[in-house]
Protein backbone atom coordinates (compact mmCIF):
# COMPACT_ATOMS: atom_id res chain seq x y z
CA UNK A 1 0.00 0.00 0.00
CA UNK A 2 3.02 2.30 0.02
CA UNK A 3 4.13 4.82 -2.59
CA UNK A 4 6.96 2.68 -3.99
CA UNK A 5 5.02 -0.56 -4.43
CA UNK A 6 2.10 1.41 -5.88
CA UNK A 7 4.30 3.05 -8.52
CA UNK A 8 5.95 -0.25 -9.41
CA UNK A 9 2.58 -1.97 -9.88
CA UNK A 10 1.27 0.88 -12.05
CA UNK A 11 4.38 0.68 -14.26
CA UNK A 12 4.00 -3.10 -14.68
CA UNK A 13 0.28 -2.82 -15.52
CA UNK A 14 0.95 -0.06 -18.05
CA UNK A 15 3.63 -2.21 -19.70
CA UNK A 16 1.29 -5.20 -19.89
CA UNK A 17 -1.51 -3.19 -21.48
CA UNK A 18 0.81 -1.42 -23.92
CA UNK A 19 2.25 -4.73 -25.12
CA UNK A 20 -1.00 -6.70 -25.08
CA UNK A 21 0.14 -9.13 -22.38
CA UNK A 22 -2.90 -11.08 -21.18
CA UNK A 23 -1.29 -13.56 -18.79
CA UNK A 24 -2.17 -12.50 -15.25
CA UNK A 25 0.43 -11.70 -12.61
CA UNK A 26 0.12 -12.49 -8.90
CA UNK A 27 -0.09 -9.41 -6.67
CA UNK A 28 0.57 -10.01 -2.97
CA UNK A 29 -0.70 -7.64 -0.28
CA UNK A 30 0.03 -8.66 3.29
CA UNK A 31 -2.58 -6.94 5.44
CA UNK A 32 -1.17 -6.30 8.93
CA UNK A 33 -4.59 -5.30 10.38
CA UNK A 34 -3.27 -2.21 12.23
CA UNK A 35 -3.14 0.04 9.19
CA UNK A 36 -4.83 3.14 7.85
CA UNK A 37 -8.31 2.80 6.35
CA UNK A 38 -7.10 4.80 3.37
CA UNK A 39 -4.46 2.15 2.70
CA UNK A 40 -7.14 -0.54 2.50
CA UNK A 41 -9.21 1.64 0.16
CA UNK A 42 -6.20 2.13 -2.12
CA UNK A 43 -5.57 -1.64 -2.27
CA UNK A 44 -9.26 -2.24 -3.03
CA UNK A 45 -9.13 0.24 -5.91
CA UNK A 46 -5.93 -1.22 -7.40
CA UNK A 47 -7.25 -4.78 -7.18
CA UNK A 48 -10.78 -4.15 -8.43
CA UNK A 49 -9.68 -1.89 -11.30
CA UNK A 50 -7.14 -4.41 -12.60
CA UNK A 51 -8.72 -7.84 -12.19
CA UNK A 52 -8.26 -8.40 -15.93
CA UNK A 53 -4.48 -8.54 -15.40
CA UNK A 54 -3.88 -9.67 -11.83
CA UNK A 55 -4.37 -12.61 -9.50
CA UNK A 56 -5.04 -10.87 -6.18
CA UNK A 57 -3.55 -12.34 -3.01
CA UNK A 58 -4.89 -10.19 -0.17
CA UNK A 59 -3.54 -12.07 2.84
CA UNK A 60 -5.22 -11.64 6.24
CA UNK A 61 -3.57 -14.52 8.09
CA UNK A 62 -2.49 -14.49 11.75
CA UNK A 63 1.23 -13.72 11.86
CA UNK A 64 3.68 -12.74 14.56
CA UNK A 65 5.60 -9.49 14.66
CA UNK A 66 7.40 -7.43 17.30
CA UNK A 67 5.77 -4.96 19.66
CA UNK A 68 8.58 -2.52 20.39
CA UNK A 69 6.45 -0.39 22.73
CA UNK A 70 6.10 -2.92 25.56
CA UNK A 71 8.45 -5.10 27.60
CA UNK A 72 5.50 -7.13 28.91
CA UNK A 73 3.91 -7.96 25.56
CA UNK A 74 6.96 -7.99 23.25
CA UNK A 75 5.14 -9.66 20.35
CA UNK A 76 1.66 -9.42 18.90
CA UNK A 77 -0.30 -11.36 16.28
CA UNK A 78 -2.24 -9.48 13.64
CA UNK A 79 -5.59 -11.01 12.71
CA UNK A 80 -5.42 -13.10 15.89
CA UNK A 81 -8.81 -14.88 16.08
CA UNK A 82 -8.66 -14.74 19.89
CA UNK A 83 -8.52 -10.91 19.71
CA UNK A 84 -11.19 -10.41 17.06
CA UNK A 85 -13.08 -7.97 19.27
CA UNK A 86 -9.98 -5.73 19.32
CA UNK A 87 -9.04 -5.83 15.66
CA UNK A 88 -8.08 -2.37 14.45
CA UNK A 89 -10.02 -2.92 11.22
CA UNK A 90 -12.66 -5.47 10.28
CA UNK A 91 -11.39 -8.11 7.88
CA UNK A 92 -12.34 -7.25 4.27
CA UNK A 93 -14.97 -9.49 2.67
CA UNK A 94 -14.03 -9.75 -1.00
CA UNK A 95 -13.85 -13.17 -2.66
CA UNK A 96 -10.07 -12.82 -3.01
CA UNK A 97 -9.42 -12.27 0.72
CA UNK A 98 -7.22 -15.08 2.07
CA UNK A 99 -7.69 -15.94 5.73
CA UNK A 100 -7.19 -18.80 8.14
CA UNK A 101 -10.24 -20.68 6.85
CA UNK A 102 -9.51 -20.63 3.12
CA UNK A 103 -5.77 -20.19 2.58
CA UNK A 104 -4.07 -22.42 -0.06
CA UNK A 105 -0.51 -22.13 1.29
CA UNK A 106 1.22 -25.41 2.15
CA UNK A 107 4.09 -23.49 3.81
CA UNK A 108 1.96 -21.45 6.20
CA UNK A 109 2.38 -22.14 9.91
CA UNK A 110 0.10 -20.59 12.47
CA UNK A 111 1.55 -17.30 13.73
CA UNK A 112 4.68 -17.47 11.57
CA UNK A 113 6.42 -14.14 11.00
CA UNK A 114 5.60 -11.62 8.29
CA UNK A 115 9.17 -11.81 6.94
CA UNK A 116 9.17 -15.61 6.76
CA UNK A 117 5.87 -15.67 4.88
CA UNK A 118 7.05 -13.11 2.32
CA UNK A 119 10.23 -15.10 1.71
CA UNK A 120 8.38 -18.38 1.13
CA UNK A 121 5.52 -17.00 -0.97
CA UNK A 122 7.61 -16.71 -4.14
CA UNK A 123 8.57 -20.39 -4.03
CA UNK A 124 4.94 -21.41 -3.47
CA UNK A 125 3.78 -19.24 -6.37
CA UNK A 126 6.41 -20.75 -8.66
CA UNK A 127 5.27 -24.27 -7.75
CA UNK A 128 1.74 -23.44 -8.92
CA UNK A 129 3.22 -23.03 -12.41
CA UNK A 130 5.37 -26.15 -12.53
CA UNK A 131 8.45 -24.82 -10.75
CA UNK A 132 9.30 -22.53 -13.63
CA UNK A 133 11.58 -19.54 -13.18
CA UNK A 134 9.69 -16.94 -11.16
CA UNK A 135 10.39 -13.23 -10.91
CA UNK A 136 9.22 -11.53 -7.71
CA UNK A 137 9.05 -7.78 -8.31
CA UNK A 138 9.70 -5.84 -5.10
CA UNK A 139 8.90 -2.14 -4.85
CA UNK A 140 11.79 -0.87 -2.73
CA UNK A 141 14.30 1.91 -3.31
CA UNK A 142 17.92 1.90 -2.19
CA UNK A 143 17.77 5.43 -0.75
CA UNK A 144 14.92 4.56 1.65
CA UNK A 145 17.18 2.88 4.23
CA UNK A 146 20.52 1.14 4.66
CA UNK A 147 18.78 -2.25 4.85
CA UNK A 148 17.13 -1.67 1.47
CA UNK A 149 20.35 -0.38 -0.02
CA UNK A 150 22.11 -3.53 1.18
CA UNK A 151 19.37 -5.79 -0.24
CA UNK A 152 19.91 -4.29 -3.68
CA UNK A 153 23.63 -3.55 -3.80
CA UNK A 154 25.44 -6.16 -1.73
CA UNK A 155 28.33 -7.75 -3.60
CA UNK A 156 28.05 -11.32 -2.27
CA UNK A 157 24.64 -12.04 -3.81
CA UNK A 158 23.83 -14.14 -6.87
CA UNK A 159 21.83 -12.34 -9.54
CA UNK A 160 19.87 -13.12 -12.70
CA UNK A 161 22.08 -12.81 -15.79
CA UNK A 162 24.29 -10.30 -13.95
CA UNK A 163 21.46 -7.79 -13.56
CA UNK A 164 22.48 -5.70 -10.56
CA UNK A 165 18.88 -5.05 -9.53
CA UNK A 166 18.15 -8.76 -9.03
CA UNK A 167 18.86 -11.29 -6.27
CA UNK A 168 18.58 -15.07 -6.44
CA UNK A 169 16.42 -16.43 -3.62
CA UNK A 170 16.50 -20.10 -4.66
CA UNK A 171 17.16 -22.12 -7.82
CA UNK A 172 14.21 -20.76 -9.79
CA UNK A 173 13.14 -17.77 -7.69
CA UNK A 174 14.59 -14.30 -8.19
CA UNK A 175 13.73 -10.97 -6.61
CA UNK A 176 13.87 -7.94 -8.90
CA UNK A 177 13.95 -4.32 -7.72
CA UNK A 178 12.95 -2.33 -10.83
CA UNK A 179 12.74 1.08 -9.13
CA UNK A 180 15.69 0.59 -6.78
CA UNK A 181 17.52 3.62 -8.21
CA UNK A 182 14.52 5.97 -8.04
CA UNK A 183 14.51 8.86 -5.58
CA UNK A 184 11.49 10.03 -3.59
CA UNK A 185 11.04 12.96 -5.95
CA UNK A 186 10.88 10.55 -8.90
CA UNK A 187 7.96 8.72 -7.28
CA UNK A 188 5.82 11.83 -6.99
CA UNK A 189 6.89 13.18 -10.38
CA UNK A 190 5.69 9.93 -11.96
CA UNK A 191 2.36 9.99 -10.10
CA UNK A 192 1.72 13.60 -11.05
CA UNK A 193 2.87 13.46 -14.67
CA UNK A 194 0.93 10.32 -15.52
CA UNK A 195 -2.06 10.94 -13.21
CA UNK A 196 -1.65 7.65 -11.36
CA UNK A 197 -3.61 6.39 -8.36
CA UNK A 198 -1.80 6.43 -5.04
CA UNK A 199 -2.62 6.00 -1.37
CA UNK A 200 -4.43 9.17 -0.28
CA UNK A 201 -2.91 8.90 3.21
CA UNK A 202 0.13 10.63 1.68
CA UNK A 203 -1.98 13.74 1.13
CA UNK A 204 -2.68 13.80 4.86
CA UNK A 205 1.02 13.24 5.60
CA UNK A 206 1.79 16.30 3.49
CA UNK A 207 -0.89 18.44 5.16
CA UNK A 208 0.45 17.34 8.57
CA UNK A 209 3.90 18.67 7.64
CA UNK A 210 5.64 15.29 7.37
CA UNK A 211 8.76 15.58 5.14
CA UNK A 212 8.72 13.51 1.95
CA UNK A 213 11.59 11.37 3.23
CA UNK A 214 9.66 10.45 6.40
CA UNK A 215 6.38 9.40 4.80
CA UNK A 216 6.16 5.67 5.51
CA UNK A 217 3.24 3.22 5.42
CA UNK A 218 3.76 0.40 7.93
CA UNK A 219 2.27 -1.23 11.00
CA UNK A 220 2.73 1.02 14.02
CA UNK A 221 4.36 -1.07 16.74
CA UNK A 222 7.62 -2.29 15.15
CA UNK A 223 11.20 -1.41 16.06
CA UNK A 224 11.51 1.30 13.41
CA UNK A 225 7.85 2.13 12.84
CA UNK A 226 6.94 3.20 16.39
CA UNK A 227 8.12 6.74 15.57
CA UNK A 228 4.98 7.05 13.41
CA UNK A 229 2.55 6.06 16.16
CA UNK A 230 1.47 9.64 16.83
CA UNK A 231 0.53 10.11 13.17
CA UNK A 232 -2.40 7.72 13.58
CA UNK A 233 -3.83 10.11 16.17
CA UNK A 234 -3.48 13.07 13.81
CA UNK A 235 -4.44 11.50 10.48
CA UNK A 236 -7.13 8.97 11.42
CA UNK A 237 -8.37 9.62 14.97
CA UNK A 238 -11.00 6.89 14.68
CA UNK A 239 -8.28 4.36 13.81
CA UNK A 240 -5.98 5.68 16.56
CA UNK A 241 -8.47 4.72 19.28
CA UNK A 242 -8.30 1.08 18.18
CA UNK A 243 -4.52 1.17 17.65
CA UNK A 244 -4.05 2.19 21.29
CA UNK A 245 -6.37 -0.54 22.52
CA UNK A 246 -4.84 -3.27 20.33
CA UNK A 247 -1.50 -3.94 22.08
CA UNK A 248 0.14 -3.23 25.40
CA UNK A 249 2.22 -0.05 25.55
CA UNK A 250 0.91 1.66 22.41
CA UNK A 251 0.01 4.94 24.12
CA UNK A 252 3.31 4.90 26.03
CA UNK A 253 5.06 4.56 22.68
CA UNK A 254 3.11 7.51 21.33
CA UNK A 255 3.90 9.76 24.31
CA UNK A 256 7.55 8.85 24.82
CA UNK A 257 8.78 7.84 21.36
CA UNK A 258 11.65 10.14 20.45
CA UNK A 259 12.64 10.63 24.09
CA UNK A 260 15.24 8.99 26.31
CA UNK A 261 12.52 6.69 27.67
CA UNK A 262 12.63 4.70 24.43
CA UNK A 263 16.33 5.10 23.74
CA UNK A 264 15.72 7.44 20.81
CA UNK A 265 17.83 10.31 22.09
CA UNK A 266 21.35 10.43 23.42
CA UNK A 267 21.49 8.44 26.64
CA UNK A 268 23.65 9.64 29.52
CA UNK A 269 25.16 6.95 31.71
CA UNK A 270 23.57 7.15 35.19
CA UNK A 271 25.92 8.38 37.90
CA UNK A 272 27.84 5.59 39.61
CA UNK A 273 27.36 3.11 36.74
CA UNK A 274 29.58 1.73 34.03
CA UNK A 275 27.88 0.52 30.87
CA UNK A 276 28.51 -3.02 32.09
CA UNK A 277 26.84 -2.44 35.46
CA UNK A 278 24.03 -0.48 33.80
CA UNK A 279 23.40 -3.32 31.35
CA UNK A 280 23.16 -5.84 34.19
CA UNK A 281 20.89 -3.47 36.12
CA UNK A 282 18.55 -3.11 33.14
CA UNK A 283 18.41 -6.88 32.70
CA UNK A 284 17.35 -7.29 36.33
CA UNK A 285 14.41 -4.90 35.78
CA UNK A 286 12.93 -6.94 32.93
CA UNK A 287 10.26 -9.66 33.16
CA UNK A 288 11.97 -13.04 33.44
CA UNK A 289 10.97 -14.29 29.98
CA UNK A 290 12.09 -11.06 28.32
CA UNK A 291 15.34 -11.06 30.31
CA UNK A 292 16.11 -14.60 29.17
CA UNK A 293 15.69 -13.62 25.51
CA UNK A 294 18.14 -10.72 25.86
CA UNK A 295 20.61 -12.78 27.89
CA UNK A 296 20.67 -15.54 25.28
CA UNK A 297 21.24 -13.01 22.51
CA UNK A 298 23.99 -11.19 24.43
CA UNK A 299 25.87 -14.44 25.12
CA UNK A 300 25.79 -15.30 21.40
CA UNK A 301 26.85 -11.74 20.55
CA UNK A 302 29.84 -11.91 22.91
CA UNK A 303 30.93 -15.39 21.80
CA UNK A 304 30.67 -14.47 18.14
CA UNK A 305 32.92 -11.43 18.35
CA UNK A 306 35.37 -13.18 20.69
CA UNK A 307 35.68 -15.96 18.13
CA UNK A 308 36.04 -14.01 14.88
CA UNK A 309 37.41 -10.71 16.18
CA UNK A 310 36.55 -7.25 14.87
CA UNK A 311 37.72 -5.82 11.54
CA UNK A 312 39.50 -2.56 12.41
CA UNK A 313 41.16 -0.07 10.09
CA UNK A 314 44.70 1.09 10.84
CA UNK A 315 43.51 4.56 11.81
CA UNK A 316 40.94 3.11 14.24
CA UNK A 317 43.52 0.75 15.79
CA UNK A 318 45.50 3.81 16.86
CA UNK A 319 42.45 4.97 18.85
CA UNK A 320 42.27 1.72 20.85
CA UNK A 321 44.04 1.10 24.15
CA UNK A 322 46.85 -1.38 23.26
CA UNK A 323 46.40 -3.09 26.64
CA UNK A 324 42.79 -3.93 25.70
CA UNK A 325 43.34 -5.60 22.35
CA UNK A 326 45.29 -8.24 20.49
CA UNK A 327 46.07 -7.29 16.90
CA UNK A 328 46.35 -10.51 14.91
CA UNK A 329 47.72 -8.61 11.89
CA UNK A 330 45.49 -10.82 9.76
CA UNK A 331 43.16 -9.24 7.24
CA UNK A 332 39.45 -9.68 7.90
CA UNK A 333 37.23 -11.40 5.34
CA UNK A 334 34.42 -9.00 6.19
CA UNK A 335 33.84 -5.99 3.98
CA UNK A 336 36.60 -5.12 1.51
CA UNK A 337 39.23 -7.20 3.31
CA UNK A 338 41.40 -4.15 4.04
CA UNK A 339 41.07 -4.20 7.85
CA UNK A 340 43.02 -6.09 10.50
CA UNK A 341 41.35 -8.63 12.79
CA UNK A 342 41.48 -7.38 16.38
CA UNK A 343 40.35 -9.34 19.43
CA UNK A 344 39.48 -7.67 22.72
CA UNK A 345 40.95 -9.14 25.90
CA UNK A 346 37.83 -8.11 27.81
CA UNK A 347 34.52 -6.67 26.66
CA UNK A 348 35.05 -2.89 26.37
CA UNK A 349 32.62 -0.72 28.27
CA UNK A 350 32.38 1.81 25.47
CA UNK A 351 34.35 2.57 22.31
CA UNK A 352 34.12 6.32 21.69
CA UNK A 353 33.62 6.99 18.01
CA UNK A 354 33.28 3.29 17.19
CA UNK A 355 30.12 2.25 19.04
CA UNK A 356 27.95 3.24 16.10
CA UNK A 357 29.70 0.67 13.91
CA UNK A 358 28.23 -2.82 13.71
CA UNK A 359 31.56 -4.67 13.81
CA UNK A 360 32.38 -3.87 17.44
CA UNK A 361 31.49 -5.45 20.74
CA UNK A 362 30.75 -3.25 23.77
CA UNK A 363 28.54 -3.15 26.85
CA UNK A 364 27.06 0.14 25.62
CA UNK A 365 25.72 -1.50 22.46
CA UNK A 366 24.00 -4.15 24.56
CA UNK A 367 22.53 -1.45 26.83
CA UNK A 368 21.14 0.40 23.84
CA UNK A 369 19.42 -2.74 22.57
CA UNK A 370 17.49 -2.96 25.86
CA UNK A 371 16.70 0.75 25.98
CA UNK A 372 15.36 0.65 22.42
CA UNK A 373 13.23 -2.38 23.33
CA UNK A 374 14.95 -4.20 20.48
CA UNK A 375 14.05 -7.68 21.66
CA UNK A 376 15.15 -9.31 18.40
CA UNK A 377 18.51 -7.47 18.75
CA UNK A 378 18.53 -6.26 15.17
CA UNK A 379 20.77 -3.40 16.30
CA UNK A 380 23.32 -6.11 17.14
CA UNK A 381 22.93 -7.57 13.63
CA UNK A 382 20.73 -10.51 14.68
CA UNK A 383 17.87 -11.89 12.63
CA UNK A 384 15.02 -14.05 13.90
CA UNK A 385 15.65 -17.82 13.92
CA UNK A 386 12.98 -20.48 13.57
CA UNK A 387 13.68 -21.60 17.12
CA UNK A 388 13.18 -18.05 18.37
CA UNK A 389 9.96 -17.70 16.39
CA UNK A 390 8.57 -20.82 18.07
CA UNK A 391 9.69 -19.51 21.45
CA UNK A 392 7.99 -16.20 20.75
CA UNK A 393 4.77 -17.99 20.00
CA UNK A 394 5.00 -19.79 23.34
CA UNK A 395 5.48 -16.44 25.08
CA UNK A 396 2.52 -14.93 23.26
CA UNK A 397 0.27 -17.77 24.42
CA UNK A 398 1.57 -17.36 27.97
CA UNK A 399 0.88 -13.62 28.04
CA UNK A 400 -2.58 -14.15 26.55
CA UNK A 401 -3.40 -16.51 29.41
CA UNK A 402 -2.18 -13.93 31.92
CA UNK A 403 -4.30 -11.11 30.46
Residue ranges and their predicted role:
Residues 2:
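Conserved G/P- and acidic residue-centered "switch" motifs that form tight phosphate/ATP-binding loops
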Residues 5-403:
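Nucleotide-activated chemistry modules centered on ATP-dependent adenylation/adenylyltransferase
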Amino acid sequence: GGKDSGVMLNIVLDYMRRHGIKRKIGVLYMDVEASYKRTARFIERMYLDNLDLIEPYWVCLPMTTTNAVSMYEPFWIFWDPAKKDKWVRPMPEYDFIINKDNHPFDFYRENMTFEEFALLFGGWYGRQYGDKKTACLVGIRADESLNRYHAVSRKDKLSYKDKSYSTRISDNIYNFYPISDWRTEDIWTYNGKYHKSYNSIYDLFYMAGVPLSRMRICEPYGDEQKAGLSLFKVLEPETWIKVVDRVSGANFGNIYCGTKATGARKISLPQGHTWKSYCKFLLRTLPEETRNIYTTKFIKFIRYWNRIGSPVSEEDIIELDPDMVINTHEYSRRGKGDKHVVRFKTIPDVLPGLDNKTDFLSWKRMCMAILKNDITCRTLSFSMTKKQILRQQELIRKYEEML
